[in-house]
Amino acid sequence: MGELSPVCLYLLLQGLLLCNTGAARNLNELKMECPHTIRLGQGLVVGSVELPSLPIQQVETLKLESSCNFDLHTSTAGQQSFTKWTWEIKGDLAENTQASSTSFQTKSSEVNLRGLCLIPTLVVETAARMRKTIACYDLSCNQTVCQPTVYLMGPIQTCITTKSCLLSLGDQRIQVNYEKTYCVSGQLVEGICFNPIHTMALSQPSHTYDIMTMMVRCFLVIKKVTSGDSMKIEKNFETLVQKNGCTANNFQGYYICLIGSSSEPLYVPALDDYRSAEVLSRMAFAPHGEDHDIEKNAVSAMRIAGKVTGKAPSTESSDTVQGIAFSGSPLYTSTGVLTSKDDPVYIWAPGIIMEGNHSICEKKTLPLTWTGFISLPGEIEKTTQCTVFCTLAGPGADCEAYSETGIFNISSPTCSINRVQRFRGSEQQIKFVCQRVDMDITVYCNGMKKVILTKTLVIGQCIYTFTSIFSLIPGVAHSLAVELCVPGLHGWATMLLLLTLCFGWVLIPTITMILLKILIAFAYLCSKYNTDSKFRILIEKVKREYQKTMGSMVCEVCQYECETAKELESHRKSCSIGSCPYCLNPSEATTSALQAHFKVCKLTSRFQENLRKSLTVYEPMQGCYRTLSLFRYRSRFFVGLVWCVLLVLELIVWAASAETQNLNAGWTDTAHGSGIIPMKTDLELDFSLPSSASYTYRRQLQNPANEQEKIPFHLQLSKQVIHAEIQHLGHWMDATFNLKTAFHCYGSCEKYAYPWQTAGCFIEKDYEYETGWGCNPPDCPGVGTGCTACGVYLDKLKSVGKVFKIVSLRYTRKVCIQLGTEQTCKTVDSNDCLITTSVKVCLIGTISKFQPSDTLLFLGPLQQGGLIFKQWCTTTCQFGDPGDIMSTPTGMKCPELNGSFRKKCAFATTPVCQFDGNTISGYKRMIATKDSFQSFNVTEPHISTSALEWIDPDSSLRDHINVIVSRDLSFQDLSETPCQIDLATASIDGAWGSGVGFNLVCTVSLTECSAFLTSIKACDAAMCYGSTTANLVRGQNTIHIVGKGGHSGSKFMCCHDTKCSSTGLVAAAPHLDRVTGYNQADSDKIFDDGAPECGMSCWFKKSGEWILGVLNGNWMVVAVLVVLLILSILLFTLCCPRRPSYRKEHKP
């Protein structure tokens, strides 16, 4: 077989690529949204997908097939007889005959179709119990093509058993994807988890529940009873539209509807359920459905042939069905059932919109499927905070976030969130990767800012590596690792301290010996350099003296400059006879020959060496060199002294390096007690405080006249709370803009079944009676007849967010002061003060980005934050404005579709409508320019009918605070505080070290007074590592203190000023293989009590506590350290034996 040419190979490759592209286009996604917690009795889950159009000739061979692992119900897979009802132009019309109502005819025939949504009785009702899934499809057809819509309904338990599978219809493949949302049991609407509870509107006031607009999918079920009119569904529609006298509509059945993505079945009609009545009324108004066409046909045209009638079934002697014949883009369902027959007669009418007007009596049909919308009350699921933790993995970190009730929002500026998620019960977990650990990892999850300290990850890796290396003694290795793996200078100080303790007796003489050798070599070089320099200076002096007395020292023959007189005399004798003055070898008596010889002669320095030897010989054994050479670095006294001094200095450095950096917000490690301020003048504080930060100020106010009189002063400012009086404007809706052309060839403009006439928001313009030949298709040659109807309407409405308008704003902080025994609290507003006889605390002003009349838009839960709109239309809204389509409790508010229609004509073509107004919804415009709007985050929101309160977690707002304490205090009365505080340590959890933190539980007893505002600290013997403000009441109080810091020997106690609990508790060691993030909002605390910083005595106390902690801890560690110390001393003794005493050396 010959080789293929390059052209053939290229064509073959192109063919394969085209085949793959075609296969990809035939794959469609059907998404099934499931809550992530599945319980019994939660009904059915439903989904649908619109497939591409297919030729009408293929419909009769269509078969819905499945490769899914769930059990499909076979009731919809069987063949069912349909009356195919079509229209066409009469064949006997002469050429150029003007179109009229008699130009068209209909035909009826019987066909068998499989897989359509003909659901028998009790199939849906028993699907959940029998674990059966229902798959079917519906058809929307014109004369040439049909567009299928596939529906899938199944028990909600399939969300557990199935993740993905394939369905097929003809040559189209349908990828069914079961996606678990972050909702526990609700449905995802507007980005929030909504549980529709229809009974809430009947039993609770309106401000206690929310109302959402949800999609409804309904399927016709035939149920025939032998007597009565209870199942004659058409009679319910006729009663609803107040139509009387219709007696021939005997079809019996009902609609079974599913609300949203999952629900219990809803029966329509049902007298005891107002949801059923709402759906029934919407069916009566929009008999073909409220979802008019697929999105890709948003701008399309149709040509209406006119009203037609036909026979169903085809064997009927007279017409039993009527409708409107059209050509162009398919709209509504083309399948239905005749209402006049007792036994169901199914009709498939491609290119005909069947009659659905319930205000007439005859020739009506009901659609097999109906899609619409309904507003329902319900409750929004409560959200919980996320827990985020990370582990080191390669150059980055692997992180995981989980929440008990689902994660509705997660993002990170430093990590890649890939949404790989899993569920365990009601928990949702998401894994992601952070590429960099050179900076702290920040994650926003469920409205909270989480920060993972990456230095603690590195510490954990250090502990793991150290323990792995010394795995033979893991207990000792881990205990040493948690001491050594400390970041910064503190860690290096710990390492040096342990090295000095264990190996100092070997390292000190070794390092001293090396340093001495280096110093001796340096001293020798310096002395040698000084000797050579002096010799060169001597030679220069000799040369200058000779030149002054005798003249030039340049040889007249070889022109060489000599340095001594003997050298010049030798040149004069030898150079003139052609001999070298240095080596005495013969040469030419010329300048060039002699100079060339001097370059290779090895004895040119002979006269300088003779002069050097005549001088005193250098003896490098005096002064510094001799002292260094005789230094006894192996002396036990020297080594022991240096060892002790180094241990003391390193302990001081270790304790001093443990202090943290001073920060504006957050805890700063201080010693016990609080600061003292002599009240010589008024005490004034003036500062700016971030909105998310609380502030604690504590001092002892001292009487300048009597230093023994001190008054405890405590000031507590809580976080800023934003109070907004709001007006609930409703729910903002998104919609698809539709532009339709409906052309009618003959007659005047009649109100045919145009799709926009049942839409909630539409405008229409009719161009009646064509006046020129240039605006008619070939088969409509008439002039002065016909109609072009242009319609613009909004379809596929979807609720996207809640909207609130700010009526008024207040910024408040709760201020509490304790001055001696006097305690006062007040919630202070902007430009307001808390005033007592001695203290004045004012909130002077607030820098804010919110203003009254601003509009707040929430596209999800309140905790997710929102957007601020300065301009929001409320009265006259145009399509495309913010707030253009609103769903309110009083109904839908439609925008003005501003613009003008234009009819585009061309000779012998159908007219097409054009619209020159805006075609993009306000929501889509907002999403395209979302970054241009101000955003805000929300923490701890509280909402009611007319008020919204929250805390700003980003510190984007700031308050100006002014505090004045008068110097005219009654020290005699206030300094004598009868309150007695006793402290006891109850429990502790967490770990010591700055990265992890601990939680200390204290029991604080207050006696002798009813209430007392103060701060309780978590301290060890030397320093304090955390504090909390507590308003103590008489009796026992349980106080939780969160702190960070300490060391392995820290016994954390509960302290008040200088008084501490009698016992302390030791926290766990920091096992930092996984580091959990902390809430940034929880750490936004500014604490200032003026306590002194840790000094020399504090350092020694801290070091001593650490040493005692090591000794009282893992005894194996102490044993290993002592053994290493003994071994180093023995090694020192062997390498540096004791020198014999002087007397023994000179003993006679």
From Swiss-Prot:
Site residues by UniProt (Cleavage): A658, E659
A Pfam family matched in the record: Hanta_Gc_C
Transmembrane region(s): 496-516, 638-658, 1115-1135
Residues of the signal peptide: 1-23
Chain spans, region Binding to the ribonucleoprotein: 526-543, 598-615, 602-613, 621-635, 1131-1143, 1131-1148
Gene behind this protein: GP
CCHC-type ZnF: 555-575, 580-601
GO molecular function: zinc ion binding
Disulphide-bridged cysteine pairs: C34-C159, C68-C165, C117-C136, C141-C146, C183-C193, C218-C257, C386-C445, C390-C399, C415-C434, C462-C485, C745-C780, C749-C787, C761-C894, C775-C905, C790-C913, C816-C825, C833-C842, C873-C877, C979-C1009, C1002-C1054, C1019-C1024, C1055-C1060, C1094-C1098
Chain ranges of the ITAM domain: 621-644
Homology family: Belongs to the hantavirus envelope glycoprotein family.
GO terms of biological process kind: fusion of virus membrane with host endosome membrane; signal transduction; symbiont entry into host cell; symbiont-mediated suppression of host innate immune response; symbiont-mediated suppression of host TRAF-mediated signal transduction; virion attachment to host cell
Residues spanned by motif YxxL: 625-628
Name assigned to this protein: Envelopment polyprotein
UniProt cross-references to PROSITE patterns, sorted A to Z: ITAM_2
Residues that carry a glycan: N142, N357, N409, N937
Gene3D superfamilies tied to this protein: 1.10.8.1320
